[in-house]
Amino acid sequence: MKKLGIFGNAVVLTLVFCVFLFAFIQCDNGTTSIYEGITVVCLGDSLTAGHGATTPGLVDRSKSYPAYLQNKINIPVINAGISGNTTTQGLFRVDAQVLSQNPQIVIINLGANDFFQRIPVTTTRDNLQNIINKVNDGNRKIYLVKFYTEEIAMELFDVFGVTDYDFQAIIDQYDELFDSLVSENDVTLIENIWCGVWGIHMSDPVHPDAEGYEIMANNIFNVLQPYLQANDLLK
């Protein structure tokens, strides 16, 4: 009986130790336990995925703008970027790759590939509106990234050799697209993501290098910071 008692105590102590160890591992993940289960999800294309960060033509998520944001935020930042995605493909992924992550914050950075592929602006707008509708539950903070400036858009036409296009008309349509989405929905616009990046820290004509993605992350963070600070989500 004495031996059985010693054995039983050992089992109990072992179980207690395992419970504490499991709790420690669960909490020791760079997040604060009070926020466990909520995330930031970055839905996007190659600019979110980290295309060209370290090697031109290849994706390196460890040097993407979501990875750099993670250094500043105390809840997980999920990179839901896939190179080449249009808004149609992004919309298709919302349920499986955004809502499934229980996001508190969603950053939508889509539209560049629609622009390159000359997808009708009305289609792009409808897709972005449907993405917002799916994501918006009344509690989530939603950010919409404007992927261009007028000057950059003009340069992109040159990069892709586009000549049979009314440049100013298409830029005006995209400006109206973003303005209307922001005015009609509870979303915050992120502009000037290319500040300090475009033409300086680039791996190819349209993608940043690692340093460029870090600067881009800082540009995005500057817009997120008031909300993050107000909700105690900063590291």
Model-derived segments and their meaning:
Residues 28-83, 93-102:
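Serine-esterase "nucleophile elbow" of acetyl-processing enzymes
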Residues 48-49, 84, 114, 149:
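Active-site micro-motifs of SAM-dependent methyltransferase domains
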Residues 23, 78, 143:
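Conserved Rossmann-like nucleotide-binding pocket used by diverse enzymes
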Residues 51-52, 88, 117:
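Short N-terminal helix/helix-N-cap motif within the alpha/beta-hydrolase-1
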Residues 4, 18-37, 233-235:
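Bacterial Sec-dependent N-terminal signal peptides
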Residues 67-72, 91-235:
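Alpha-helical cap/lid subdomain in secreted, periplasmic
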Residues 2-13:
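Bacterial N-terminal signal peptides that target proteins for export
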Residues 82-87, 166-168:
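Short, flexible loop segments at the rims of nucleotide/cofactor-binding pockets, characterized by
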